[in-house]
Amino acid sequence: MVSSITRIQNYVIDGAATSNGLETVLESNFAPSLISLPATPLFGTDGIRGKVGELLSAPLALQIGFWAGVVLRNHADQLGPVILGQDSRNSSDMLAMALSAGLTAAGLEVWYLGLCPTPCVAYLTSMSEAIGGVMISASHNPPEDNGIKIFGANGGKLSQALQAEIEKGLRGNLPITSNVSNCGRHYSRWELVKNYGEALKRPWQNKVNLQGMKVVLDLAWGAAVGLAPSVFAEMGAEVISLHNAADGDRINVNCGSTHLEMLQAAVQEHNADLGFAFDGDADRVLAVDPTGRPVNGDYILYLWGLYLKQQNQLPDNLIVSTVMANLGFEKAWQQQGGKLIRTAVGDQYVQAEMIKTGAMLGGEQSGHILCSHYGMTGDGLLTALHLASLVKQSGVSLAELIDQSFQTYPQLLRNVRVVDRDRRLSWQNCTPVQQAIALAEKAMGDTGRILVRASGTEPVIRVMVEAANAELANYWTNELVAQVQQHLAP
């Protein structure tokens, strides 16, 4: 007899069976969960993300776990576990357990890591017999949000094609099925997080240490607590930690990579060499130099790229970034004999372009940095260790390295809250907004750039204007924001 899992796989992949026909042959232990899905695609630029109790719920996580399990299993060369981790949000326990129930209902073994950074899940997935990984986190979003990120067996973000297969299953209105003979098991494997910590230090063993450096770390009450300070201390640095406890009520609140003010003050107060701010799941990081000046992903990519180029380790002197990368960065990198390729915003697009072109280094202005030598997922801790090591090896301060790099073009970024998801994702159909963009682009010509886009992770439309001077950038930003507010966010 063909198992119910096999028949569901056939439905998801081939569309060969109808919903009603399939339901008649399933030995179901679970009634179909009542879930409400938006009309627009569920997966955004960084997995599935939304407010808990609105978009995200335990029933939905159960369904996602089941259908993700079916799809991962169908595409696996051989059966293996799924690695599951989470950040510190109050809702993460609930979603992780529900998702694990779905995965085990799909017949898969779950290795549960508990609290850990997203790149820890990606690394352990790629270095084990796992067929996939899942992280429960909403990254830099506020505490009331949460999300589900799914990784393939290689530790990279799941492809859009496989995401579409999962969503097809979710929208098929089929019951979750399982029986005693095909249930998977859930195992706590907290000890594996230590393996990730050791891997972070490995590139510099017997080469570079951070002795004599004072580093301030803002852990954002999130997934990097404990781990990041211990790794930096073991590398020899004197560490001062901010927000270094797992706190689901305060994760990312006025701290971390989206709020650098406390880190800037602490770096100057303690006369530190540099500071790092992580987001809630530690897949991104921003830095602060000794003067308190912010150092974003553009600068990190430039400095890391220049180091690799000088070592003849950067294929074709190529860096992949996004449409958000500053023109100043691009022009400076070109002057170094390098080439910059831009993608849509989202590290999954950067990852795809890196694979396509064979690029070693890529990332985003927001602090997602990918180096294919270490994997294909942004890793805030690895990036921070690399930048600290570059500073130590250079013999000069991070402030001096930044002064020697490039001048940015004035760039303004404003977020306009648009609660209606369908209106937000279809904003390009709004004629007045499109006309305003065309007018601004014509006025600035090749001396500036405009980017308007719906966020894939937050209920906002982002308006970015880059211009030859701050006055122009401010003027056109205000004009475009007014149009978006008037026509899309009444």
Curated annotation (Swiss-Prot):
The active site is at S139. It holds the Pfam family PGM_PMM_I. It comes from Nostoc sp. (strain PCC 7120 / SAG 25.82 / UTEX 2576). This is Phosphoglucosamine mutase. It catalyses: alpha-D-glucosamine 1-phosphate = D-glucosamine 6-phosphate. It comes from the Bacteria. Catalyzes the conversion of glucosamine-6-phosphate to glucosamine-1-phosphate. Its EC number is 5.4.2.10. It is an enzyme of class 5 (isomerase). Its cofactor is Mg(2+). Activated by phosphorylation. One of its GO terms (cellular component) is cytosol. Mg(2+) binds at S139, D279, D281, D283. Belongs to the phosphohexose mutase family. Signal peptide: none annotated. GO terms for biological process: carbohydrate metabolic process; peptidoglycan biosynthetic process; UDP-N-acetylglucosamine biosynthetic process. Binds 1 Mg(2+) ion per subunit. Coiled coil: none annotated. GO terms for molecular function: magnesium ion binding; phosphoglucosamine mutase activity; phosphomannomutase activity. Keywords: Isomerase, Magnesium, Metal-binding, Phosphoprotein. The modification Phosphoserine is found at S139. The keyword Membrane does not apply.
